[in-house]
Regions:
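A short, Lys/Arg-rich alpha-helix, primarily the initiator
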Residues: 1-18
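Residues within the helices of the helix-turn-helix
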Residues: 13, 24, 54
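The alpha-helix within a helix-turn-helix
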Residues: 16, 27, 57
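Flexible coil/turn residues that form the inter-helical turn or adjacent wing/linker of helix-turn-helix
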Residues: 19, 49
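Short alpha-helical DNA-recognition segment
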Residues: 21-40
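DNA major-groove recognition helix of helix-turn-helix
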Residues: 41, 68
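The DNA-recognition helices of helix-turn-helix-type DNA-binding domains
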Residues: 44
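DNA major-groove recognition helix of helix-turn-helix/homeodomain DNA-binding modules
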Residues: 51-66
């Protein structure tokens, strides 16, 4: 798992928990499947599409940069 993938997974989980949001709620707000959110958070998706990361960032009220910071 790359450093970027690990940071993205860790930061999505951090922002989601900070917002007291379940993976299911995040998936609905982002218009993605629960499976997609779970795979990205676990690091199983090594290179998610920029559009997907943008939708997650918008749902979490943060920027893509905040999700990628190490």
């Amino acid at each position: 798992m790359s450093k970027t993938t690990l940071s993205l997974a860790r930061n999505i989980k951090k922002y989601r928990r900070k917002s007291a949001m379940s993976q299911d709620k995040l998936s609905k707000r982002a218009g993605l499947t629960l499976h997609t959110i779970a795979k990205i958070e676990s690091g199983a998706t090594l290179d998610p599409r920029v559009e997907t990361v943008k939708r997650i960032a918008d749902a979490l009220d943060c920027t893509i940069d905040e999700l990628l910071v190490t």
